[in-house]
């Protein structure tokens, strides 16, 4: 094991971040793609705060040809160009679409995607070794309401 700090002298912050990143498997420079640049996808692009913690969105894709170009400093391509424009070092995709979800996931897995952040509210299958993190705001609000009611009863 590595020694990250020295007694009475503190920590070398860069060394600590690099060491923790290695231990936790975080690259801190992940290339992320976004599928779906509608209202939610655009909000995600605009927010894009994870570029300071885990990486950044390097490309977005949408089925609307009118969205091709650049938004918030990120290149946006038509979904038909996914295979030809896919960043080769990308392992994470954010899904913010409502149609063709399984087909899109299948295409992403063929390209080597290993992690999916899912905003789709759709059920889809992934192969072994692909991790999915579902984000459901409705469920989060329901859980919050339950906790608040529980606190009120105490």
Each predicted region: which residue ranges?
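Hydrophobic, well-ordered beta-alpha structural blocks that scaffold small-molecule cofactor pockets
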Residues: 1-111, 127-154
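Short, ordered loop/turn segments at secondary-structure junctions
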Residues: 120-122
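Internal alpha/beta core interface subdomains
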Residues: 110-118
């Amino acid at each position: 094991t590595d020694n990250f700090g020295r007694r009475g002298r503190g920590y070398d912050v860069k060394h600590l971040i690099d060491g923790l990143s290695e231990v936790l498997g975080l690259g801190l420079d992940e290339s992320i793609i976004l599928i779906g640049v509608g209202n939610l996808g655009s909000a995600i692009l605009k927010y894009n705060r994870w570029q300071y913690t885990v990486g950044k969105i390097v490309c977005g894709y949408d089925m609307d040809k009118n969205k091709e170009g650049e938004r918030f400093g990120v290149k946006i391509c038509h979904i038909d160009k996914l295979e030809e424009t896919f960043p080769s070092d990308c392992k994470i995709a954010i899904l913010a679409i409502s149609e063709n979800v399984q087909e899109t996931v299948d295409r992403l897995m063929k390209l080597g995607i290993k992690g999916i952040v899912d905003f789709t509210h759709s059920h889809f299958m992934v192969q072994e070794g692909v991790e999915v993190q579902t984000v459901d705001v409705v469920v989060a609000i329901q859980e919050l309401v339950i906790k608040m009611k529980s606190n009120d009863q105490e």
